[in-house]
């Protein structure tokens, strides 16, 4: 079924910022601010790299992810799922 193969928004977003090496600001649920680029991710965590150091960040600890530059995930002609 096509819905089974479709990527979810989270994976689409993270894969895009990983491939384009877009700098991110990530806020954790405890208020801590992290910055860097995503080098890897899976269902539970992501690897954030900055100044040659990597941090493993668990997704359940993330509150907000803000890209450092505008991104376009979908073609402008596509309908939004909402």
From Swiss-Prot:
InterPro entries: Hfq, LSM_dom_sf, Sm. PROSITE patterns: SM (PS52002). One of its GO terms (biological process) is regulation of RNA stability. Pfam families: Hfq. One of its GO terms (cellular component) is cytosol. Residues 11-71 form the Sm domain. The keyword RNA-binding applies. Keywords: RNA-binding, Stress response. Belongs to the Hfq family. Homohexamer. RNA chaperone that binds small regulatory RNA (sRNAs) and mRNAs to facilitate mRNA translational regulation in response to envelope stress, environmental stress and changes in metabolite concentrations. Also binds with high specificity to tRNAs. This is RNA-binding protein Hfq. It comes from Rhodopseudomonas palustris (strain TIE-1).
């Amino acid at each position: 079924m096509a819905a089974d193969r479709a990527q979810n928004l989270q994976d689409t977003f993270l894969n895009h910022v990983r491939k384009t090496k877009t700098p991110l600001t990530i806020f954790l649920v405890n208020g801590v601010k992290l910055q860097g680029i995503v080098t890897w991710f899976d269902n539970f965590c992501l690897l954030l790299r900055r100044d040659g150091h990597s941090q493993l960040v668990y997704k359940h600890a993330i509150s907000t992810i803000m890209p450092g530059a505008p991104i376009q995930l979908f073609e402008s002609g596509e309908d939004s799922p909402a």
